[in-house]
Every structure is written in structure tokens, then in C-alpha cells.
């Protein structure tokens, strides 16, 4: 390849080169005597092109001579591993290892960036070098750490005494040996067999050994020091993501993928590769994963899965307003990967040659198998190479993980110089041409049908009319009798005319409105649909991409109109959060409500698209996931697709999945700063979240807040040797849990562009608002037994463990059962429950005349809940099974089975309770007050009041 240093630098680039050169001259005064004129010119050229190279060489000028003495030529990739192992052999502690790894990484990255910018290397060689370097750094760190830990804890062995290694799966581009310049690395840690360590002072379970090792290995690579980092390590692709153990055995891995593996995990596994020297364990691992990834039959279902994944990416691009993104945009790098991997997933079960991690290898195989024509292969490869070259150079400018084209002239000039282009316009033309070719093949292979623009309609004429008589005549001619539509449309159009939309937005609106009007006029009351839809349009007039989304997707238009008609609440959600319009594109997917058990894995997949270290985007993603899933539940609810009995179940399971991720994120953020409590074993948190009220009773509604209590299991008496966390900034363990609780509440309550996640109410904790934010679990138990009021025991009936350590779950269950089973005077208990109910009614009941408040009116939801709570508190001493459930419906079932409540009474209470809750959901979606006409509920109310009288006034 041509040496680009012989070309003259553009003016702006040359200025930057001179600035860096001055810095180097200060660090190395006799530089001019050490270098030839040609070397000086070349060094100045690379200084102008890459701030990263200049920064590193100004810090380490001694590298320059060795680079010119032969390091800039092609090096054998195998040498990375042997060099690193040799250097690390002399390291005594992890701080030394961190310094060695980072300096080696930076030195090699300088060499590779130099070769890339000045045309010394073909792209494929650069990608192979970058991948080999990453693999060598990971494996050298692993091997050094394994040796240290075996000395410290003994060697992990299987049942026959064979040493067990830590196996590392490299995912994504690392697995495919196609790593880009400044990439994070996705890894999965695993080990072959369970067993124990041998040769240490005390034996330790293999999994605990490898979890400790995995944590330390991530820290060796990930932590930012004065020398930077080695790689940003992302472990979220492991089974169960952040909520799963950091390391699992081969059998644990196999069980997970056989029983719970998702389609997106199949896609991720196509590129999975065991890193390091190949061994029998590597073969075993790949043989085990193969049946999950590659089905024995031709598997066309993979296409739909990839299509959904691409839709998620498109939504993310739109929501984050990512423009000029050569990876995620239409025709970007990801679309080439989708095209190739769709063939691999469909046919890899039948064609062993397709079972490879390399995209280049797979695409050549597709040509040999006749699946792609020569022109398609050539255009895809050349376009992909073009985009990957641009991506690599973009990242090598400042060692930044970016796929977005430059915002500034300087970086455009750097790219154009390295690529031999005259300027931004020429380079943009090449990039746009490459992306257009890729997108064409993507649509043919994966993309599905896209709507075409269709012929002019009479509604287009209506949208452009000014004269009232003409408009009314046109409407009448086409059978639209409603008189309110035209005045509403004309008024709104006048308001829109005053808005600053821009030519593209106005043009798109003019194309969209005739289609929306077609939807309105098919309805009996078009204006009733137009008004809420116009509020949504008001919010997206300046977001042209959303106007285009509605124009290009007939299904989205139909769903927008029908859902706004069915529920003002949904209309308001769409207006407040326009990103939800993405959910309307595919009606089949919109009404395919996530199954209850899948919320955690769906959320995990959703969060994978956001960098783990970007806390702001993580918080935003949590809120967007909640909003989109809530929309799906509401859409299925108002259209009758989801039975009303299941609405609360879905809203509750959704909340639990979010609680899990919030706690994990908070834990990660606090422990990153302070370390973890030193008394904990790896993977333990010593922390639990307890749900009260609707969260505890599996009865959340659309606008429900969360009643939560936080518990931990640490006391100084129990763990006298552990008083602080084990991080760089240690703090008292009690203070750690307080910070964790505060962080959790912050993540819930922070208002981002997508609003607040949930409102959290902590007043049910011991001593209420004056109590500690997080309580030690035994203190919680003693408080409940000795200090809590009856109303707090009533609240405990509806309490349920939501997330945290299993040991705390078991202990909380015991404590709750013990407190509920305390012997109580039934007459005194009934009196206290009645008084509390009356107090609530006095303070909270505000109802219009002739109406019934679903919650607080006599015979309403609160009365039913108090009946259940009284009966549990009065009878659990003799019937412990009453403490099993926290939801009212199952409590009534158990009371009926135990004959503590007549079967007919239990049935009437359940029917009334479900009816009132269903009406509550319906009224929320209609944005109506929680009231019904009194006569509509009389039968249910009379039954409830009769049972209330019998149970609580007679002290049953």
C-alpha cells in the first residue's frame, strides 16, 4: 500500500501536528538529531492524524526509535502471547500486572494506528492484529491470575483430581477475529466441572474460586488507572445477565441454553469462540453449544428474530437521534452482519461449513454454496470493508468507541487524508453508496416489506382546502356526516401553520395527513379520534423521523387511531413519550404481550444495547422499557387480547424485573466506588427488597407507586472481623447499605426525558419516615414482634420478597410467618381493624353524590382487603398455611378450604374484588375518576358489607 506520509497534510491537520510536535520536543529535546528528515516528516504526519498516537508518544518518546527500527512492519501475531507471558512472569502483584498490560496494549495500539493511518496495513490484517492483541492480553492476564490464585487457594479440580481451567468465550467481533480499534469486549466465563480446590489451606468450591477469579480478571482489564484501561469488559451476555453468577460450569451453561436460551442469544453465539490455546475443553465447549445455535433443520424462524432485533436497533437510533451512524444506521455494519448471520442460523445446521465465527469466511462459503451470487458477495464485502476502514480510523483518532461520522472539519480532513479522498463530499458519497448497497441486500434477505407511497386521495384535497363550504361539500360527497371534523381540522391546521417545523417536516406532514384522515373518516365519530391523535402529532411535529414513521407504516397509523379512540390514557402516553410510536409498527408484536417469566430476559436484552458505563442512558433505557411494555399491556387490555385478570400480574412482573435491574445497577455503582461488604461471599449481596401493598399483593395498576422496604443481614456482632467494604475507598458496611438504598431510590425517582421510573414509598419500613432507610433483618423481625402496630401487621399480610439474596428470602418468609402467627385476642383485633378502617374512610373518602368510590366507599376494595387481613391475623396461629400467600384472591381460597370463611362468602368477596379492580384498570385507561354510579355496584356492595359486618363486627 502507498505510504501516505509522502502526501502534504491539510492546513488544519498540519496545525495540530505542529502543536503535538512542540510537546514532544519538550519531552525529548534532541529529537531532531535522533531522526532522519523522512522519519521526522512521517512522525509529524501521524501526529496530525491521531491525537491518541501523539498523546502516547509524548508520554513514552522511547517507543519512537523502536517503532522506526522495525516495529512498524508486520509482526507475527503469535508473538503477542509469548511476549506478554514472558513479561508477566516477573510481576509480583496485580498493580504491576495492570501497568504491564496497559502499557503493552497502548504501545501495540500506537503501532497499529500508525500502520492504519499511513497505509502500511490492509484492513483485514489490522482486524486480525487487533483481535490477536486483545486475546493475548486477556489470556495472559487470566494465566497470571490463575497461578496466583492457585497458590493462594489451591488448584480447582474435578472429582478425579484433574485441574480445571477458567475458559473464556470471546463474543462478537472478538470471537470473529474482526475487532475494531477501540472496542469493548463481550466475554462469558465458564469452567468444565464442579469440584473443590486442592493444595490450599482450606478447600473451596470450584465455582466460588472461579467467580473470585473472574471478578479480579475483569478488574485487571477494566479498571482505569494512570495508564488508562486495557479493555472495557462487558459480561452481560452471560446466562441471566447481571443477575446471574459471573461464572457457571459447562453443565450450567448447557442447561441454561437448552431450557431458557433466547433467539438473540443464538445470534450472539454464532461468533462465540473459546479464547487461548485450543484444548479438548475448547472442543467440548463448542460441541455443547452447537445444537443451541445451529438447528438440525433449515430454520427460517431465525429471519423473524433477526428482523425484530433490527427493529429494536432502528428504534434506538431514532430515540437517541443518532445520525451518520455507520454501524447502526440503515445500511450500516450491523446490517451486513445480520445478512450473513441470517444464512448461518437458517442453514448452519445442515451446512457445517457455515459454522464459523468469521464474517469474511462465512460470506465466501455462502457464495460456494450458491446462496449468494458473486455480485452480491463482492458488493457486500467491498461495502463492509469501506465502512470498517472508516470505523477503525474514526476510533484511532482519539481511542474513542464511536461509529458516528465527524462533526468537525478537522476529523473529516484526517479521514479523507488517510483514505486518499479529496474531501468530505467525496468521502460521504462513497459511504452513502456503500450503505445503500448493504441496505438493499438487507431488505432482500431480512428486512421484510416496506410500504410504498400510494396514489393521491380525496383526503389530500380536504387537507389543502381553505374554504369552509368546499370542505363541507367534499365531506358530504364522501358520506362523512359529522359536522365537528372540519372545524377541528381547520383550527389545528392553523395552529400548525404557526409552528417552526422546517421544510422536510412540513412536506412529510402534508403526505401523512391524507392517510390519517382516511383512518378517521372510517369511524362513526371521526372527531373523537382526531382530537387525541392531534395531541400526539403536536409533540412530533419537530421530530420528522416520527412523522415519517407514521407515513411509511400503515399499521402504525391504524394502531395510533384505534388506541387513541379506545383509551385517552394511551393517547396521553403516546403524546408524552413519542418514542412509543415505534411499538405500533408491527401490530402482531404490539399485542404479543411478553410472557410473565420473560420480563427479566427481555429487559436484559433491551439494556444490552446501552453501554454499561453510561448511567444516564441506562436510566433512560429502563424507563423506555417500562413505558413500551406498559403500552403493550394496555393495548392488549383495551382490545380484550389480554384477559383483565392478568393485567395486574403483567404490571407486577414488569415492575419486579425493573426492580432487579435497578438494584443491580445501584450495587455496581456503589461497589465500584467503595468495594463490597467484606463479609460477603462472591455473588452475594446480603440485601433484599420487600414489596408491600399492591406490589406485594401482585395487584399493581397502570399508575401504581411501589411500597418497598429494604433489608440487609449484617451486624458487627455476627461478623466482628468484617466492618468495612473492601474497595479503594472503604466505608462502614452499614453506611454501604445506606448508600445502596439511596442510590436505588435515586435511580427510581430521577426524572429523565422519559419521566420517572416509579414513585417509591418507603413509609412502611420500621418506625416509618423516622426509621432507617434500610434495616437489618433480625431488627426488622424484633420490631414487628415487639413494636409494630396492628396496621403494620395488616400491611405485612400483603408483604412479599421481590429481589435479593436467597438466604434473606428464606429468613424473611420465616419472620413474616412468625409475626402473622402471633396469638391475638380476636375481639380486640377486630376493634383495632375497624377503627383503622374508619379512620381511613374519614381521611380519604371523597366521592360525588350518587357515586361509589372503588377503593374507599363502604363495601369497596379497602373493606375487602381489611376482611382478608383480619382473618389472616386472627387465624394464622392455628392455621400456618394462611401465611403462604400475600394476594387477596388466594387468601380467600385458603380461608374457604380451611372453612374459616363460608365458600359462598369467599366466592362473593373474590368476585367483588376482581370486578372492582377491573373497573379501576378500565377507568384509569379512560382517565376517569375511580368512581362508578352507585346502582351499578349495589349487588357487590351489599354482599361485601354483609360479610364485613359478620366478620369484623361479630369478631369471627
From Swiss-Prot:
CDD domains reported for this sequence: NT_GlnE_GlnD_like
Record-level GO cellular component terms: cytosol
GO molecular function: [glutamate-ammonia-ligase] adenylyltransferase activity; [glutamine synthetase]-adenylyl-L-tyrosine phosphorylase activity; ATP binding; magnesium ion binding
A Pfam family assignment: GlnD_UR_UTase
Single GO BP term: regulation of glutamine family amino acid metabolic process
Keyword Nucleotide-binding: yes
Catalytic activity: [glutamine synthetase]-O(4)-(5'-adenylyl)-L-tyrosine + phosphate = [glutamine synthetase]-L-tyrosine + ADP; [glutamine synthetase]-L-tyrosine + ATP = [glutamine synthetase]-O(4)-(5'-adenylyl)-L-tyrosine + diphosphate
Keywords on record: ATP-binding, Magnesium, Multifunctional enzyme, Nucleotide-binding, Nucleotidyltransferase, Transferase
Enzyme class: transferase
Cofactor(s), by name: Mg(2+)
Region described as Adenylyl removase: spans on this chain: 1-450
InterPro entries attached to this UniProt entry: GlnE, GlnE_rpt_dom, NT_sf, PII_UdlTrfase/GS_AdlTrfase
Segments for region (Adenylyl transferase): 456-956
EC number annotated for this UniProt entry: 2.7.7.89, 2.7.7.42
Physiological role: Involved in the regulation of glutamine synthetase GlnA, a key enzyme in the process to assimilate ammonia. When cellular nitrogen levels are high, the C-terminal adenylyl transferase (AT) inactivates GlnA by covalent transfer of an adenylyl group from ATP to specific tyrosine residue of GlnA, thus reducing its activity. Conversely, when nitrogen levels are low, the N-terminal adenylyl removase (AR) activates GlnA by removing the adenylyl group by phosphorolysis, increasing its activity.
Sequence similarity: Belongs to the GlnE family.
Designated name of the protein: Bifunctional glutamine synthetase adenylyltransferase/adenylyl-removing enzyme
Originating species: Shewanella loihica (strain ATCC BAA-1088 / PV-4)
Gene: glnE
